[in-house]
């Protein structure tokens, strides 16, 4: 199944946010040569149970990773921030603030968003490590 970029389901959108956050963390860790799990991966179960509260925690933690990626000349960070913004704009305010557990649909959004990373694009967007998107 391909990523549905205009699908507005709360669970699907939260899954997409988690995938983008994980991507930012992964690439920041790769730049510094760190070999550990991302916060997004470690907090996935908590995220499924309390998405609004856990997203706030993850988003605050992203700042230090984004600082590491500032030195990247590829536009990777700008693209990820834009992606986060586009996903956040699709939320209904009440859905975004709803801390009820997510259904399995969040995993669909998560994996479809992650798969987008490996799809072939004709753009020149690359990761900080030079990997083509």
What are these regions (language model features)?
Residues 1-133:
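Intrinsic-disorder/low-complexity detector
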């Amino acid at each position: 199944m391909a990523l549905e970029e205009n699908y507005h389901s709360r669970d699907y959108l939260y899954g997409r946010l988690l995938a983008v956050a994980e991507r930012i963390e992964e690439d920041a860790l790769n730049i510094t040569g760190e070999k550990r799990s991302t916060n997004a991966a470690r907090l996935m179960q908590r995220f499924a149970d309390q998405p609004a509260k856990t997203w706030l925690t993850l988003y605050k933690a992203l700042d230090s990773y984004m600082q590491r990626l500032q030195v990247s000349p590829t536009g990777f960070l700008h693209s990820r921030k834009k992606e986060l913004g586009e996903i956040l704009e699709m939320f209904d305010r009440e859905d975004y603030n709803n801390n009820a557990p997510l259904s399995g649909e969040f995993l669909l959004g998560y994996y479809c968003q992650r798969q987008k990373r490996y799809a072939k694009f004709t753009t020149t967007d690359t990761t900080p490590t030079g990997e083509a998107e």
